[in-house]
Each structure stands twice: as C-alpha cells, then as structure tokens.
Amino acid sequence: MKLRTFIPVLVVLIFATSTAAQQVTSGGPRRGYTPEPGAKDLKAVLFNWTWHMGMLRGAQEVEAVATLEHQATGVIQVDGQPCRLSKYRVSTNYQAGGQRVQYTCARPNGQQYSNIEVVSGQFAWNEDIVGAEIVPGKGKATPMVAALTERLIRLWAGPQGAPKAAIAGGDKTTVAWENNKAVVTYPIPGVPGAVAKATLSDKYQAERVEVAHNGVTTEFTYGKYDDWNNELNKVEAFYAGTLVEKRNGATIRDLTTTETETGNVYVVVPVPASVRASAQK
C-alpha cells in the first residue's frame, strides 16, 4: 500500500475585519436537531442546505467553513468585451467578508489582460501584485469604491456565501416553496437594500440566486456540484462546477470549476492605508 503524504496548504493573503462579515460566522442549527422528513420550515431548509453542501463540521455539526480557494476556466467581461481566461483564482475569507480574485485573460484581439480585484468589509480595491502596499514600496493598490456593491453581492450570493448570509439574516430571512423547490430570501450583508432570492434544487443546493438592488438585477446560476478538491484532499464539501453571472440579462462571468480547497486554508489580508484614506475623503 502506498502511503499518502498530506501537505498543509498555507495561503497568506490579508483581509480587513468588517462588522457585517463578523455576523456571518459559524452558525446554523446545532447537533441534536434533525429535520423531520419532508419538513419545509426555514430551520429545516437552512439545515438541509448546509448539510447537503458539506458545510457542517465536527460532532456538533456546526457550520464552520471559514475560507475557500476556487480555480476555474471560462470567460469574463472586461470593458464590455469577452475575455477568455487562462488563470482565474478566488481566495475567500467568509469571516472577514473578504475576497481576492486574480485573473489573466485574452481579449478578442488576442491582447492579454490581468487584474487582481479585492473586497474586504466596506473597502474595495485593485492590486497590481498580491498584497500591494502591505510592504511599503511594494505594489500599487487602487481604490475601487464603485465596485464595492458588486463584489459584496458576488461574495454573498456564491454557492457557500449564500447559505452563510441566509443564516446571518436571522428574522429577515424567509422561505417559500415554489414548484416544490425551496426559495430562500435574505439580505446581502454590507449592502443596505440588497435582497437575494436563492432557489434550491431537490438536493438543497443553490441552483439560482437573484439579487435585486437599486434597479439592478444580478442573477447567478449554479450546477454540477461536486467535491472539486485535489484527489489527496477530498473532504466531501461541495461546490458548483458551473457558475454563470448575469447583470440585467448580460453575461458577466461564465465559469467552469477546475479545483477547490475547502479545508479552511489560511486566508487573511489588511486593507492598504491608501485605500482607507481614500474612503474617508
């Protein structure tokens, strides 16, 4: 028999703590609660949603997914044009409300384009290198105040972010049943007035999340859920294999998952001082 060596994965990023994100921490029904077969109340739906996603951890079955690494291929929109990806990596810290998206893609004319998009709490910025300006003189961080809402919506409407935000919504989260499918309505953390409606499949995994905010409708569709972790690190935590994002009907991102790391790798990131200063002006 071959012995497998498991190597811990360390991802060092740096995200600021936000009040909204701190509310989206470990939660959900505790062990000792088991929904009755066919139960359709909110408590049962939230339990089944996180259970079928593999997000309940430990003997107490507490929702304790803190971070996510996600890699994909596909096409995203850049300056209104499709850009085919050669690299797409998302590093998420749910407890800090932070997410960094690194990507490189080719425009229709073949020109290469790269960017690093970051959101952390109530701050959004772009980087020319990972962790720009954290070490003085290293890299450039560009504030992106106008992108804050879009990035927070993407974070909390994601396959894992949605159930976390729904749990954090407390009495503002509701459930209805349409065509024998649970539809969970919840507020998007950190975006006042943004309301999400998540339609779950018969396996209690989000197949569609629609977010309405200030006249803009952002729709996320998900499919082909699986454990996309490396073969040496399968943990039966499931993530969408296909992810499509549309804004007012126009496709913004069309992604196919290649790999995830759902074992709570270390993801942390401070907001650069220049970004904080810009937000205070």
Please give the residue ranges for each predicted region.
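Boundary at the C-terminal end of the N-terminal hydrophobic targeting segment
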Residues: 20-22
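N-terminal mature ectodomain segment of secretory-pathway/periplasmic proteins
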Residues: 34, 38, 44-133, 166-171
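Catalytic loop of the DD-peptidase/beta-lactamase superfamily, centered on the K-T-G motif
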Residues: 107, 116-122, 132, 139-146, ...
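Gly/Pro-enriched, hydrophobic low-complexity segments
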Residues: 178-278
